Amino acid sequence: MSHLAILPTVLRDLELLVGALEGLDLQPERDSRVIGFAGEAQPVAVAIRLQDGQQLGWRRQQDGSLALVGDLSRLSRRHDLPPLLGEITRAYAARLALREASAHLPGAELTVVS
């Protein structure tokens, strides 16, 4: 039996996460729900739907971090999940680095080149 699981992450900024997801053409949906086995649902701040229809979402934790929400039993069968999560994390980190750099270098023009 599969069910939705909530995993802690180091991500904290929802806007940076949404920007990273959009940059990867993952079409984030704000204020959504992730649906798991037998209709089990968890509200999330943002969700994406993968090509096979499975969902990943992120919800705010009490400590301010964004926890990953998904049906891990089903998602663990996907061989592309670890690389995808790595891409999302790298895109988030790049946006965070640009934001921090622009805060320390007012007037500088900074862009991401991939």
Predicted regions: what they are:
Residues 1-114:
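Interaction-mediating elements
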